[in-house]
Amino acid sequence: MKKIVGKRVMGMALAAVLLLSPLSCFGVGTAYAATQYEMKTEKTVTRGVTYEKNSRMTDAGVQNIHVMKVDLRESTLEIKEVESKGDYGLKETVKKLLTDNGAVAGVNSDFFGLSGSYSAAFGPIVRDGEVISAGMTLNKTEGQYAAFFMDEDGNPFFDYFTMTAKFGNEKKMLELAGMNKFASLVFPAYLDRNAMSNTSSLDKRFEKLVKFVVENDEITYISAEGENVTVPANGYVIVMSADYRKNAAHMFTVGDAVVLDVTSSVDLDEMETSFGGGGKLLVDGKITTANSIVASGRQPRTAFGVSKDGNTAIFMVVDGRGDSIGATHWELGLLMQEYGAYEAMHLDGGGSSTMVAKTAEDGAMTVQNEVSEGSERKVINAVGIFQNAKQGKIKEIRIQPSATRALMGRGVTFTVYGLDEYYNRIEIPANQVKMQAIGVSGKWEGYTFTPSTAGTYTVTATYNKMGAYHIGAVSSKTARLKPTNDSIKLKVGETANIAMTLYDTDGFMHWASTTTKYSVGNPAIGTMNSNVFTAKKEGSTNIKCEKDGAVAYITVTVGDVEAAKKPVVAEVKDVLDQKVTKKNDGAYYFNVAGKIAYTGTEEIDEKVYNDARSKVKSYVDANANVAIYGGLNDIQSKKKLDSLSWTGQYRFLSRGGVSLAMVAATNGGINATDATQWAKFTADIEKANNNTIVLVTDQTPSDWKSAAEANYLRAVLNKYVEQGKKVFVVSCYNKSYWSSVKDGVRYINLPNLWQADGTVNENYTMLRFRVKDGNVSYEAVNIK
C-alpha cells in the first residue's frame, strides 16, 4: 500500500544551514589531514557502479577511504533502503541485510537505538514508492537528522524532515510517536501492512499492548491486552500500552469515526525513495557547520551524496579507530567534494560504518572496509544498490589465481569466469577453457597448474575466441619453515593441529601445514597423522618438520614433565648475500655504512676515536663507485669519490640503476619526523624508475611508534616488488646487525660504530652492493 491511510495536510519546514568556507570554518592555522601519498585500487561492481579504495598517507597518519559511485542514469540500477527480512525491526549486520535483500552493494544507513535486538531507524523510509515508516520526534527545534529523498520523477534532494501525526475521534486527538516505528511504545504508534501483517511480533517485544483496528475511517475492533490482531489490508492499527489506553485513550470505542491528520515537510506519497541519516554535510557544494549530533574529532564515518547534475550518487566510508585515523566532519566534506558530491549528508558512523560490495573480482558479497569494532555491528537498516538486469551472454572473460606467488611442485588453482554486459559473473567449466603457461614448465589438471621450474610466467585462458591472462612468479626454493606454535603442551589423549608456514627465498609466505613431512623423535610419546599430533603417554619430545630441505622443530610436552631440548637449526642465508669484489665488469658498486660519529656523553681518547673512524672510512670509501653513510658521519670522504652522507633530512641519489633515498625517522617514524618525506621519496623513486631501490633510515620500521605507518611503508614497497624491482630497507640503528626478508623486501640493520659507553662496537658491519642488469648481490662485512 503506497499511501499512509488518512488525511494529510502538507507544509514545508525549511531548516537553516550555516555554510562554511575553509577560512570561516577553521581560521588561520587550523590543520586537516594533508595527503602526502596515496594508493588506489578500483573494481567494478556492476555496470554503472564502481568501488575504489584510496589508502592515503597524510601528515596525521594513514587514512583509508572507501568510495562507491553509482550512475543514476543507468535504467537497471536502483538505490533503496533495506531492513531485516526475518523480523520487522530486527537488527542485522549490513552484509546480511544487503545479501538477504538481493543487493550488489551498499552501506549502513540510519541512526538507531543501540540497546536490544530490535530498534527503529530514526528517519523516514520510502521504498519502491511505498511509505514504510516515519518518525514524529526529529528536527522539532533545529535541523539535526537529515534525510535523502528521490521523487517519482527521479529528482534527488535532502531535507531536515519533520512530521506530526494525530489520531482522534470527536472527543480527543492523540499525538502519535511514529508510523511503523516501534523502538518503544510509551506513546501510541501507527501500524500498517508495510511493516507487518499481524501484531504477534510486537506482542513478544512489549507486554499488554492494546490495538485499535481502523478501516474506512472507523474503529472496527479494539483488542484485549496482549491480543494478537490482524492488520487490515486497507486500513491500519493504532498500537498503545494498556496504561496509555486506560489513562489517556479510554474514550475511544468500536464504531467511532476517526481521523488521521498528518503534516510533514515532504509529501512522502510523492517520493520513490527515502532514507534517513545524520547532519547535512554539503549544501550547494559547500561544507556546512557540524550540528549537535555530529561526533567531534576524527571518527569512522559514512556519508552519502549526489553530484550537482543529479546523475551520480556517492557512497563513502572512512575507516577509523584502528590503522586508519578516521575523518573529521570537515575532512569528510572535503573528501565528498573531491569525489564529486554537491549535496551530501552523514549516515550513521563509528562502529556502524560498513561498506559491502560484490565486485566482479570478489564474486561474493564482501565487507570492503575495516570495521572499527573488529566485527560487523548489527544495525537497523542499510542503503542497497540493486542491479535489476537479467544475466546475459558472456562478453569478456577474466582469470584469477589462488595465490600470486607459486612454489615449484605446489599447485596453483586458477578461476576463469565470464562477465556479461552488466558485469554479472558467469562461471565457466574448466573443460571449456584452454589453459596455457608460458615461461615455466609444469602440469595442468583442470584449472590447477603445478610448476616444475622457477621464474616469471604468464598463464593464458581462451574461451570462445575470448582471452585473459595472468602474470605470476614461481619461487625456486623453500628458505625456512615456521610453525605457528614452536611448543605444544598436552594431556594424554589430546590432539593438536600443527599450522606450518613456509617462506621462500624472497620472503613470501605459503601455507604448508599438510604438505610438510613430520616425524616424532620419540613415537612412544605421540604420533602424527598428516598435521595432527596425538599424545600417547607422558613425556617430552620434538617433532621434526621438513619441506624442500628446510627444517624446523616443535617441542611437545605431554603431562607435567620437563620440556625436551630443541635441536638448533642453522640460519638460512639470503640468496642475494654473496661475496662482492669490485671489478671492471660494467657493474655498479656501492657501499653502505651506519653511524660513525659518537653522540654520547662519555669521553673517548682522541687517537682511539680517530683510528676507529679512519678504519671504517677506509673500508667504506674503497672499491666502490659511491659511498653511502647512513648515519651521522663526522669525517670527510675523498673528493674524487661520489658519496652521500646522513644529514637528518631527506636526501636522494640515483646512480647506476639504483635509487637510494635517505628518510629520517628520528622521532619514531617518517610522519613524526617530517611527513613531507613521503611525497618526496615516492615521487623520486617513481621518476627515476630504477630496478634497485635502497631506503636508508635511522630507525627500523618495526620500532616505529605507529605500526600502521610501518605497514603502509611495507605496502608501498611491495608495490615496487610487484613491478619486479629489488627493494632494500637499511636501518642504521642500535648495536646489532641483522637481516630478514619479507614479501620480497630485504630489511637490514647496520649497527652504530660506538657503544653508549664510548667503546667500539665489535658488531659494526657495513654492506657492499653489486648491481648489474637488474641483478643485485650484497655482502655484509664486519669491521673490527
Enumerate the predicted regions with their spans.
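Gly/Ser/Thr/Pro-rich low-complexity, intrinsically disordered segments
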Residues: 6-11, 29-570
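Active-site neighborhood of phospho(di)ester-bond hydrolases with catalytic His/Asp-centered motifs
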Residues: 107-109, 344-347, 591-595, 621-632, ...
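Active-site-proximal segments of metal-dependent phosphoesterases and phosphodiesterases across multiple
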Residues: 316-329, 691-732, 736-737
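Divalent metal-dependent phosphoesterase catalytic cores across multiple superfamilies
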Residues: 559-649, 710-719, 723-725
